[in-house]
């Protein structure tokens, strides 16, 4: 079998298919709570995708529950998730194209940068549990996804209810 060396296009490309070792490494890079339990700031992910869809899905659920139970604290938690996307994050940068003054360029293969578009989102580097959102434009985390944009709009609508 002959192999050829190809360039690496993103940090997770060499990791390969999901494995139990990889899963365990990501879990153990969380904050240890005891010998067998860890708290992660980011979900375990095999392909190192961004997490805006996860954040917005949970924020929408929190908004709905806050409204049902008339719970201001829960509504504030949901609002903070929206703020995370809009710039209250470790990079102090809105990830929405055109929002604020320091937003990143996004990856749109055909449409280019679309004002108001939301990317896949802030991710982690390989098996770490630290936020990672490099400036280079890459489809792994800066690709425009319609469902992340729609979820943000869905959550922003909750702010006006």
Q: Where do the language-model regions lie?
A:
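Aromatic (Trp/Tyr) and acidic
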Residues: 1, 7-161
